Amino acid sequence: MKSLWLCWALWVLPLAGPGAAMTEEQVLSSLLQQLQLSQAPTLDSADVEEMAIPTHVRSQYVALLQGSHADRSRGKRFSQNFREVAGRFLMSETSTHLLVFGMEQRLPPNSELVQAVLRLFQEPVPRTALRRFERLSPHSARARVTIEWLRVREDGSNRTALIDSRLVSIHESGWKAFDVTEAVNFWQQLSRPRQPLLLQVSVQREHLGPGTWSAHKLVRFAAQGTPDGKGQGEPQLELHTLDLKDYGAQGNCDPEVPVTEGTRCCRQEMYLDLQGMKWAENWILEPPGFLTYECVGSCLQLPESLTIGWPFLGPRQCVASEMTSLPMIVSVKEGGRTRPQVVSLPNMRVQTCSCASDGALIPRGIDL
């Protein structure tokens, strides 16, 4: 079975782009932008020979240098596996429900979340209620269903984030699917021990105006199964994941092995020598150079049978999924005097390489 699986899979050639190494031009461009300059200044060696770097400036530089190894910016995301998690309605009002999903140990270790789908069973509207509604409100038969991620903060306050929203008809019934991938991404960012995943489901009027006030009151979602008592209508959370053992990157490249088309996605070390750049002379005081990295190699592609469900996703590519900043000490000339200044250039060094699909959602960070 394993050999058959590998026969289905494809390998793509390395692509230049998000995982490419930082170039001299990019460093210069970022530095000019940070200092709001149009071109690199020309400084004489006499301007910097006798200039001492104060202790507080060097301390600031060292602190940023240490922090750059801890602070990372993320960017990246299929499904070899999916799991269903049964949820329960914790609280129910006229048009709002709060779903609670126990998530611990639901996501396999060393896996990548591709998509999370919330499935709610819309119950059919009784015929008598439907006929009465059509007689009183003939202009609109739809309601808006909104899914929000709810976070309970340590101080007891609540914060919500909009996840998905769509219109449903009161004439329909059955399973409705909502994309809640971003909510699970938010949940994964919580510190341990994590609280359960809380999803707030709101049913509202389609729009303001006469004839629309009661449509949303007829939309009901099953909380404890279908009328047959088999529990098939309760809320379900499908988690689609990939095993990164097969579909992820391998970490750092082996320096003893040359990179080829068949090399699995990895981070390759490179050194950018700032001292050898004419424009940096007498301008950049620290560092003399720095280790930079690029993401090289190929990523295992999913067989067509698994990609049909996600037509919006392109091929999996080897890209930089985490970047760090690059602190520098530069010479700044003001009023005939030259002084040292610390700057930090964001997203200048590749920290982690990953296999990600073109077109996949870039997870937002929690800002609630």
UniProtKB/Swiss-Prot annotation:
GO terms for molecular function: cytokine activity; growth factor activity; transforming growth factor beta receptor binding. Glycans are attached at residue 158. The keyword Calcium does not apply. Its main location: secreted. It is found in: Secreted. It holds the Pfam family TGF_beta. GO terms for cellular component: extracellular region; extracellular space. SMART domains: TGFB. Required for left-right asymmetry determination of organ systems in mammals. Belongs to the TGF-beta family. This is Left-right determination factor 2.
